[in-house]
């Protein structure tokens, strides 16, 4: 089996400055891939740059916001992903408590369609802020796995416990590490992790 080094910059479309930086890196062949964040403010511009440049682009599946002052809006309008009509949840806890899996799934499709409808081929998927990795206690990872399988997309998913420790800023408890192995195994059996 051949191995390839992929150097990916995610959050393409996050803001005009980041979009410009990633575009320059792609044009300069300093990175080999990017992941477009369709709910972010500069997403349409990033998609156009990707189309014009023929860039390898993934969908950076995002169901939360990073901006509490100007919250991002979902692409699907799924009600359970929006906090009191203000936009996507900033809080991982709020998202975990309120998001419905059918709304998560609808949002994943809407984000894929945002990119593909602009003439850009989506070649992989990954996730913003680990919201689809199962560490929030929700089974959104199943929705992500099924979505990727249906679209024949590889899914970038952390396979080592070191990722978990960095996410929670301490050594991950044994039960969490065990759960992560189960989630990784499920993805590997589906063939998209």
Each language-model region and where it sits:
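Catalytic domains of cell-wall/extracellular-matrix polysaccharide-remodeling enzymes
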Residues: 109-185, 189
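Hydrophobic faces of well-ordered beta-strands that scaffold small-molecule active sites
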Residues: 5-10, 32-36, 57-61, 123-127, ...
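Short, basic, helix/turn surface patches
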Residues: 58-68, 85-88, 180-191
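Acidic-and-aromatic substrate-binding clefts and catalytic sites of carbohydrate-active enzymes
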Residues: 12-16, 35-45, 64-70, 129-139, ...
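Active-site gating/metal-coordination segments in enzymes
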Residues: 63-122
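Aromatic/hydrophobic pocket-lining residues that form the small-molecule binding cavity
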Residues: 18, 43, 104, 108, ...
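Active-site beta->alpha N-cap acidic-glycine motif
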Residues: 1-66
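Acidic (Asp/Glu)-rich catalytic clusters
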Residues: 22-28, 44-56, 71-83, 116-118, ...
